UniProtKB/Swiss-Prot annotation:
Expressed in the brain. Expressed in the ganglion cell layer of the retina. Pfam families: Homeodomain, Pou. Disulfide bonds: none annotated. Residues 170-184 have a biased composition (Basic residues). GO terms for biological process: axon extension; axon guidance; cellular response to cytokine stimulus; cellular response to estradiol stimulus; cellular response to insulin stimulus; dorsal root ganglion development; estrogen receptor signaling pathway; heart development. Residues 250-327 form the POU-specific domain. The N-terminal transcriptional activation region is sufficient to induce transcriptional activity. The POU-specific domain and POU homeodomain regions are necessary for DNA-binding activity and transcriptional repression. Its main location: nucleus. The gene is POU4F2. This is POU domain, class 4, transcription factor 2. It comes from Homo sapiens (Human).
Amino acid sequence: MMMMSLNSKQAFSMPHGGSLHVEPKYSALHSTSPGSSAPIAPSASSPSSSSNAGGGGGGGGGGGGGGGRSSSSSSSGSSGGGGSEAMRRACLPTPPSNIFGGLDESLLARAEALAAVDIVSQSKSHHHHPPHHSPFKPDATYHTMNTIPCTSAASSSSVPISHPSALAGTHHHHHHHHHHHHQPHQALEGELLEHLSPGLALGAMAGPDGAVVSTPAHAPHMATMNPMHQAALSMAHAHGLPSHMGCMSDVDADPRDLEAFAERFKQRRIKLGVTQADVGSALANLKIPGVGSLSQSTICRFESLTLSHNNMIALKPILQAWLEEAEKSHREKLTKPELFNGAEKKRKRTSIAAPEKRSLEAYFAIQPRPSSEKIAAIAEKLDLKKNVVRVWFCNQRQKQKRMKYSAGI
């Protein structure tokens, strides 16, 4: 800054063709932060240059005084212009430090869906945050979300979420940020809770003091599970059962395993000598809750794999239980045949040879109604059973009656 001294008699001189740069008197008013300074606007310096030029035209002591007043007014004018510029810059919002704030909603939704694919609770410690540090409500849901790590399906690397805003990026929110920085994460809270609501029933159980305790539970592909499967899982965990008891196992749901079991069941049933209708009626004897007798067509459709997949899965454990009971009874019959042969053994048809038959006809011609002693003697002579001889004489009398009746007509 070039101006004459108050004690000198030289006129104020200004270089031709050069612009005047006024040094700010109070530099603190011209900067918004310790590391940045605001330049002085050209509009603030142009009145000062004209004033200084006028002051430099005078000579003598009066001219020196005029120059001094012009310099003072120039400084005050530039200070006023710089102050207004500083106030204008201070009123502007700080540039957002959230570099992901401008992303579209589709990218956020895709990031949320990717993070909620595989949810496995591995940490039992709570990360407590002060109320001003987090946009979420400090309730049980919040603590449960903090203890659930999300595994990315693309990278297969587990990253535990210590803050809910980590899904939108890996940066941290500080308490001096503006409220509009937290608005995307408040919208993210609702969508994330919607994705994680089935997992809360699996990975969190209420402790004795009312706090939510994260428990390790397997919940694969929660985003793609149907509501009935999730309800079955929730019911299983409510009763204290492991997760694999409340859902269908992969072995039961495999069509190849169902086909192999149906073929094995059919072969075992044929070997045991049991019909499909017998199997359907015997299911009621198993005393399984909610299971009664089934029709023969249902068993036939199971063996031919024409039932629906869900019905095949539901019917497999029932038929497997019946097959185990049937094979157990069959083994008992083999070990103790005397307990079962008397009632189940079918009597063979009696066949009498021709010589014995002619002798019986001769005895019948002499005495159609022999006494019991006579029947015993004939049986002993012909080497036949007494009951066989008695039945033959009875049948022969019925035959003679039919012949007489047909001859009389």
